[in-house]
Amino acid sequence: MDFYNPYLSKKPTDTKTPKLHTTRQSICRLVPKCFRNPTEKGVVSVSSFALPTYFFKGNENKVYLENGKSMWHLRRPCKNALLEEQSITFHIYDIVETTYSEDRCNDIPFKFQTDIIPNGTVLKLLGRTLEGASVCVNVFGQRNYFYVKVPEGGNITYLIKQALNEKFSPSCAYQTEAVKKKILSRYDPEEHDVFKVTVSSSLSVYKISDSLVSNGCEVFETNVDAIRRFVIDNDFSTFGWYTCKSACPRITNRDSHTDIEFDCGYYDLEFHADRTEWPPYNIMSFDIECIGEKGFPCAKNEGDLIIQISCVFWHAGALDTTRNMLLSLGTCSAVENTEVYEFPSEIDMLHGFFSLIRDFNVEIITGYNISNFDLPYLIDRATQIYNIKLSDYSRVKTGSIFQVHTPKDTGNGFMRSVSKIKISGIIAIDMYIVCKDKLSLSNYKLDTVANHCIGAKKEDVSYKDIMPLFMSGPEGRAKIGLYCVIDSVLVMKLLKFFMIHVEISEIAKLAKIPTRRVLTDGQQIRVFSCLLAAARAENYILPVSNDVNADGFQGATVINPIPGFYNNAVLVVDFASLYPSIIQAHNLCYSTLIPHHALHNYPHLKSSDYETFMLSSGPIHFVKKHIQASLLSRLLTVWLSKRKAIRQKLAECEDLDTKTILDKQQLAIKVTCNAVYGFTGVASGLLPCISIAETVTLQGRTMLEKSKIFIEAMTPDTLQEIVPHIVKHEPDAKFRVIYGDTDSLFVECVGYSVDTVVKFGDFLAAFTSEKLFNAPIKLESEKTFQCLLLLAKKRYIGILSNDKLLMKGVDLVRKTACKFVQNTSSKILNLILKDPEVKAAAQLLSTKDPDYAFREGLPDGFLKVIDILNESHKNLRTGQVPVEELTFSTELSRPISSYKTENLPHLTVYKKIITRHEEPPQVHDRIPYVFVGKTTSCISNMAEDPTYTVQNNIPIAVDLYFDKLIHGVANIIQCLFKDSSKTVSVLYNFVSTPVLFSYELLTDHSVKA
């Protein structure tokens, strides 16, 4: 396949352009030199007046048509709208808040013009009609508002006028109304005199409120936008079906890039909560391939081009049919099941891609790590290299945003920041973030995740092959193209596997926020919006938090584990929805809270009217339900009742699509319920109340301790009284709590068989709940272990009653371990958990002191473990272990000159490759290595390239690998000998190999397993 490249002529200095397709503004294009000479690297800069161009099936076409539309409008049906006012039914997936000013009056129907004088909020509802046409409905008349408590003698009108009269203040229409409201901050049943300040545009809210605060006023709900007012005040939703009874078609002065557009008032809308089906929303999975002139590509280097972009489309709810496209820089041979669009330069391809997002009716985009790489790279190339105005490529015109916000603070933990994709009218789902959140794997490469979830693999093309393939011509580019397309196909399959688009839409509906904010804006905004709605129903208003420097609190603690191997049944009981149930049972809320210093202000309250908790900061009180019902409790009760009803429907449902939606609905409720506690405990959150959060964790700790004492005191006779069937047991039967983890207790059941424990577990949990706790707090039997290796807090391995292996906090497939260590460690673990003789020996050892083995020797059963270690050493010594199983790999994360520490194994191998004049790895390549030769004081010097090792028959470092194995095994059986270092000593003492090597003797620990 070939085409005429208008930007490369015979003479490099000849920049003449064909007469057809010209524009007034010159465009600077970067064209790869290899298009002229396949062996030449780099780019040539060509200035041209030609409009962006593409080739499809050998025919040249313009990216943009004369009517301003793009090439993609030719490839979808045109939807015609009637000219007169009409009734329409449509589904929305996004709401965009914009502001119109009075100079836009001629663009809109006369009846809405007063809503934008001097300016006004316009909400753009984006979605699809019943017929499948994309639609934008511009909603007028929705006002934003907040509340103000004015100090005595203050004049609210004067203060607002003063704020608006200041220089650079935006013009704004406003209205004040005296109202009575309860304030949600502490127990206070009284209604207060406040002013409701309604403004025509949200642009003025902060300007006015800041001025009011500086004049001694107290403001409320200034952090609520017009979208949430629209949804909450009208009982609407951010995702679902609407009917507009009086929609005015907008034929001219269009303000969106949809098939059709209408104007209406918010009062013309009706929401259909009972309809859950989806229209055929267009989901696009994409991936980019780049080349770097000097290693890993950097978007701001002119020569580091994007060479291909794959786009895979799927209509939500359709069968597995997808449509594959490949945008290629330069000629490209055919790729199976893929439409190939060829572009003569990178800027042409970028115009093709961004116009595709805008004009191909794409509602959802997805990819793998697109928020950290693909989209930032695309945006930087477009804006920094070519000065493309990307705000022209979202789904709306006014208020358009097309950017990725990368926070400066990207730390870990609860408040960790993530890059946020912000494209107006586009829901962006980064499947890398989704997979990291939902899976627990040794790494989160697309290949690893796809293999784990859907049993699929990527095409085998390494990064270092991409440049040679690209330069080689159409066939090479087709190979890259297939690799690129398959990546997008895999991501689309992962999206379908998790059905994450349905999940986030259900969270958005429950939390009353736009769907595109679910993945990026955290849980604070979800709970805040729900609390806002609940507060409004009870005439409460919410204060604005400014307590950013408040101290934190002691989080959930555990009952320290008793490490060891347990060859008895271990019952795990846990509290169902622990934190939500504590809030419900103890009536905890802002509205029920009385600080200790304020208790004297409520002389009418008796001690029986409130519950007192002793926190680290002092006593705190919460009134009981008969005095004031907790708003948080009521919210949780409604949610949990709804979840119960949904799960009942789910059990009866047979339609797969409906089952998926119901499942995601109940999951959305579960996630949001569990977020309520965290919402109150974040000092820098939207409405923090550390006293509530600390009370919840205090109660959680107290409940664990109470349960421990109660269960351990339970005798076989007591158990028999509460169980309707005969409970068989040994004479010495007893219960011992060996670990408590936040909301779970691990109970060793001495003298009871596993089957017996499984049968009485529910009765024991229910009896404990009944005797100790108020409803709805409920202890449940979660699982039973046949045997358990309890290593430390949140680290254990066991065999469940159904014979399945369960591991928590223990990763046998470690990134820093080779397959030899992983496989042998797994073999030994399997022996300890399943071989009766080894199990008995392990149980004995875990009850003895660490030096028992040195005094008395190892039990006979445990010698099977030593036999495996001896056999492994023999295999290493005799060369029976394949080099592939001994290979490590580490990413070359940056140029070698940027490393401060050079004694790293992969850098040693890099230098050896350079010395041998072989092709060096590129930045972000993984460098494989093995350890060879005799042990030295600097382990990194022993690293060698695996291929070179095999070719030259270099002996591996037997003792180093065996030591890694010893440490790997010690890591998983350390509880038998009290700690890892003692376990290493015991193992070395009993293997038939002399102690020739140990990490403790060396100073270089850079590659420790």
Swiss-Prot record:
One of its GO terms (biological process) is DNA-templated DNA replication. The keyword Cell inner membrane does not apply. It catalyses: DNA(n) + a 2'-deoxyribonucleoside 5'-triphosphate = DNA(n+1) + diphosphate. It holds the Pfam family DNA_pol_B_exo1. One of its GO terms (cellular component) is host cell nucleus. It is found in: Host nucleus. Its EC number is 2.7.7.7. It comes from the Viruses. Disulfide bonds: none annotated. Keywords: DNA replication, DNA-binding, DNA-directed DNA polymerase, Host nucleus, Nucleotidyltransferase, Transferase, Viral DNA replication. GO terms for molecular function: DNA binding; DNA-directed DNA polymerase activity; nucleotide binding. It is an enzyme of class 2 (transferase). Belongs to the DNA polymerase type-B family. This is DNA polymerase catalytic subunit. It comes from Saimiriine herpesvirus 2 (strain 11) (SaHV-2).
